Each structure stands twice: as structure tokens, then as C-alpha cells.
């Protein structure tokens, strides 16, 4: 299931819907969490983002403790994989995966 935001805990949302859950929008969280019921393994993934944190549109996050994590999530054979964008000290892509 793909959602813009989780309804509470990402794992509780995944289990409630009886499926894995991929969530976007959460700029400061880029992670995968797992849980299991007696019959199924569930994962919930926060997908990172591809924003320009220095643009005016994202000025509201300047003082946030959690900064945006630039990257994407690939789902391969039903498993989520995090692919962070490697940046230099100026915040520019280094040209490598």
C-alpha cells in the first residue's frame, strides 16, 4: 500500500491494512521498520525525499532537528531497499550510487 502519510504508527497502519506500507512526504525520516503477526511479516518504509532543503518553499524546516534525507526507496521482489543520494559538503550529488 502506498500512502502520503501513515495513520499513526507506520507498523500499526501496515498491520491494520494487512499489507506492507510505503509512506512518502516525511522528509526527516528515511527508514524501514519490520514487525510480525503470528502469520505474516510486515514492513513499513518511509521513502525519503528529493527536495532542495535550501529553497524558500522549505524554509520552515531550517530549525527542525531532523533534516531532509535525500534519496529514494526501491521495492525489489517485495522488499524495500533504501538508496540514499550521496552528496558532497555543499549538498551536491557526487555522481555515484
Segments (PLM) and residue ranges:
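Conserved beta-sheet core of the metallophosphoesterase superfamily
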Residues: 1-87
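C-terminal/domain-terminus segments
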Residues: 85-97
Amino acid at each position: 500500500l502506498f500512502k502520503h502519510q501513515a495513520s499513526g504508527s507506520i507498523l500499526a497502519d501496515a498491520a491494520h491494512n494487512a499489507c506492507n506500507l510505503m509512506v512518502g512526504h516525511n522528509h526527516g525520516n528515511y527508514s524501514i521498520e519490520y514487525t510480525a503477526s503470528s502469520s505474516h511479516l510486515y514492513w513499513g518504509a518511509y521513502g525519503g525525499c528529493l527536495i532542495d532543503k535550501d529553497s524558500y518553499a522549505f524554509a520552515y524546516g531550517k530549525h527542525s532537528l531532523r533534516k531532509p534525507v535525500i534519496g529514494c526507496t526501491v521495492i525489489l521482489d517485495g522488499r524495500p531497499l533504501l538508496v540514499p543520494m550521496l552528496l558532497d559538503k555543499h549538498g551536491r550529488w557526487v555522481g555515484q550510487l
